[in-house]
Amino acid sequence: MASYKNNNLVRLCIMGDGGVGKTAVTIQFISNHFVYYYDPTIEDSYRKQCVIDDQVYMLDILDTAGQDELTAMRDQWIRSCEGFVLVYSITSRSSFDQVQFFREQIIRVLDRDDVPIMMIGNKSDLDDERQVTYQEGKDLARCLGMSFMEVSAKSRANIEEVFNETVRSVKRREESLLKKDKSKDGKDIKKKNSIIKKLNQKVNNTKTSICKMM
């Protein structure tokens, strides 16, 4: 049975070059529907409640623009999100080459390199038009410390898995940070107790010396 938690809101950002199918991927996940035609996105926000590993989450998904003229807006989008899905098209070598640019922008804005990022190669149903091999995608993701999947917004292949795994990555990072905080608190308490113990010993030794003099 799924259980609810107060911290079940997860904010995800979809990024990538223009025309790779970011909106198609998002809408397929949200509404089980493939959109053939749509206007270029500037910024659209979607919400979906889903159950992942017996926990209920509300996903707040930001579908962003890929156009160069909107680059200045990305910093704001990046700061508002916890996890990222970087999309390229397997039929477009240039969109694949842009992935590293988007990742570097995320790292720069957040000023850390442990960001949960899923890289996906969309349009896996168009294998006869492929310009980027699966192995190339896998190798780049491993090199840059990202998760990786190929997907098809049209056939829905791996769409659910992409978002589920990205949420898991976000939660794993949160748990890791929480453990570090608890460990630090524990060390601080031990250090404080050690100082108090030494001070008490010093006071007791002083009292003993005074008694001997008397």
UniProtKB/Swiss-Prot annotation:
Source organism per UniProt: Dictyostelium discoideum
Membrane topology: Lipid-anchor
Primary gene name: rasZ
Positions bearing Cysteine methyl ester: C211
SUPFAM superfamilies for the chain: P-loop containing nucleoside triphosphate hydrolases
Gene Ontology cellular component terms for the protein in this record: plasma membrane
Family matches, as InterPro entries: P-loop_NTPase, Small_GTP-bd, Small_GTPase, Small_GTPase_Ras-type
Motif (Effector region): 38-46
Primary location: membrane
BP GO terms, sorted: response to bacterium; sexual reproduction; signal transduction
Positions of the propeptide segment: 212-214
CDD domains linked to this entry: Ras (cd00876)
Domain of life assignment: Eukaryota
Protein name per Swiss-Prot or TrEMBL: Ras-like protein rasZ
Keywords attached to this entry: Cell membrane, GTP-binding, Hydrolase, Lipoprotein, Membrane, Methylation, Nucleotide-binding, Prenylation
